[in-house]
């Protein structure tokens, strides 16, 4: 799976939702999402860019296990939970425009 379109009004990205999607490269999480759960992106080894909106207020500590941290860039909102999480966990990040 290279591209995924979220259904309207999705509130969370569930446990193991994208587990092993090795061809997934970029994803934009909609601003209806508040939670990224346990190993939601586990082993998404080709993931290079993820946009996480300010609406996300919880990211499980294992959500990105197995992703290549040195190649993954988070696009976040300044002052958001995602920015704080990225800093605390040493993810590369940039600010959304």
Q: What are the residue ranges of the model-derived segments?
A:
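Short, structured coil segments at secondary-structure junctions
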Residues: 88-90
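Consensus positions within tandem repeat domains that build extended binding/scaffold surfaces
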Residues: 14-19, 37-42, 61-63
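Structural signature of tandem-repeat unit edges
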Residues: 1-12, 22-35, 45-58, 68-84, ...
């Amino acid at each position: 799976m290279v591209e995924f379109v979220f259904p309207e009004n999705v509130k969370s990205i569930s446990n193991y939702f994208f587990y092993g999607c090795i061809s997934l490269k970029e994803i934009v999480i909609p601003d209806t999402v508040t939670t990224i759960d346990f190993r939601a992106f586990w082993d998404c080894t080709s993931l290079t860019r993820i946009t996480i909106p300010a609406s996300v207020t919880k990211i499980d500590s294992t959500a990105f296990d197995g992703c290549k941290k040195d190649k993954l860039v988070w696009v976040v909102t300044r002052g958001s939970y995602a920015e704080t999480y990225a800093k605390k966990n040493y993810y590369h990040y940039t600010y959304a425009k």
